Amino acid sequence: MKLISFNPFIPALIIIAIIVVSCRNPMGVQPLDEAPTRGNIRISIDESYQLLYDTQLYTFESLYVNAKIAASYKPEVEVLDDFMKDSVRTIVLTRDLTKEEREYLLANSFVARTTKIAHDALALIINPGNPDTIIRDQQFADILRGKITNWKEINPTSSDKPINVVFDNNKSGNVRYFRERFNITGNFPTNCFAVNSNEEVINYVKNNPSALGIISVNWVSDKQDSISERFLESVRLMEVGTDPKNHCKPYQGYIAERSYPFCRDVYMISRETFSGLGTGFVSFVAGDQGQRIILKSGLVPATMPIRLIEIRKD
């Protein structure tokens, strides 16, 4: 009888191969240990919403102790890149996917599902020592086009100082928003530059009297959050309007009414082909508790009815 030799390394290699295939999770097959409130996943989030999603994630994981979500906060371009390359299955952006992006995913057997979760606004912030608190949307457009370069051109009584515009990141949704809104296809003028985050924008404006910063309003709108309150105390919000008589700050009521000119929506997008943890987290943020967190943050909930109250001064 012929004896067959046993190689003890073969079973180990088979197990390793199974683990590798499972980690790749081809065609979005549901892992055995994942459910809407259980599992371990990574998601990518637009850096503009770090304060908001730190709270959302803390609350969600406190309720569902078997859920572990590792969030990466990045500029919009990098968030989308993670999603399209299947590095993450769930993302947060300030725009929906394009037709071409959806078709690409569909060609790879993925259907992207978009949920609008909030209405946001881009705030223009200035140094507390700057007296120019009002600006028209077209004046800001002319600043980004290089037609206005000095604060005196905004207000003749202002100090004769150059305007230094600071964005959060060259790859951010904030930059894209204003390029699209004002149809700017070329480079911004040399007095416009980018740092690395919304927080760095706030710190730059705090230390530079002639600076004009652009951030998501949720960084300075939650007065019950110590970080947001500290930021708000270090800068001033500009009032923005379409004409000299009608202008407002990016407060919730004006965002809800779209009276404030620079409003946008916030989306959660999932490519899960099963009811996994990403789907569960999207449902939580779009549900009652998640929407209340959004309301508290200073943004406007997208799926929760809100009531606007007018307060008159007699």
Q: What does each model-identified segment do?
A:
Residues 5, 23-65, 72-77, 81-84, ...:
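Exported/periplasmic ABC-transporter solute-binding proteins
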Residues 113, 117:
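Conserved catalytic cores of soluble enzyme domains
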Residues 2-11:
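Bacterial N-terminal signal peptides that target proteins for export
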Residues 1-2, 109:
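Residues that act as N-cap/strand-start positions at coil-to-secondary-structure junctions
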Residues 10-22:
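Bacterial N-terminal signal peptides
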Residues 77-108:
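Pocket-flanking alpha-helical
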Residues 96-100, 109-112, 131-136, 167:
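Peptidyl-prolyl cis-trans isomerase
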